[in-house]
Amino acid sequence: MICLKILRFYQKFLSPLKPAACRYYPSCSEYALWQFQKKNFFLAFFSTFFRVLRCNPFFKGGFDYPRVSKNFYPINLCFKPIFLAKKQLCFLYIPYKNKSFYLIKIIFKRTNQ
């Protein structure tokens, strides 16, 4: 998706040129990146737009994790779990309300010992 490439370009080349000034964690660009990875374009755009509007001296700031809606289906517990999955776990879904979850990114790399 072109939005993800633009955001990564901003984070890699433009963001280091200015001081860190985001009032929230995760930063607005990281928040936008997570939104565009997990939501459709329009929902991600509007939630990012309103987040950037809140990132000013009139708001307190703090932790503001993205919220996503997701349907989880019960899994069949009769099979053996596969621990050597091809994809590494990237996000945690922390319950918020009904089918709404906070999205928290895992930042630590797994090391084989």
From Swiss-Prot:
An example Gene Ontology cellular component term from the record? Answer: plasma membrane
Annotated protein name in UniProt = Putative membrane protein insertion efficiency factor
What's in the keyword line of the UniProt record? Cell inner membrane, Cell membrane, Membrane
Please name the Pfam families in this protein's record.
YidD
Q: Which family does it belong to?
A: Belongs to the UPF0161 family.
Q: Which InterPro entries match?
A: Membr_insert_effic_factor_YidD
Q: According to its UniProt entry, what is the function of this protein? A: Could be involved in insertion of integral membrane proteins into the membrane.
Q: What HAMAP family does this protein's entry cite? A: UPF0161_YidD
The record's listing under PANTHER family reads: MEMBRANE PROTEIN INSERTION EFFICIENCY FACTOR-RELATED
Protein localization: Cell inner membrane
* Record membrane topology: Peripheral membrane protein
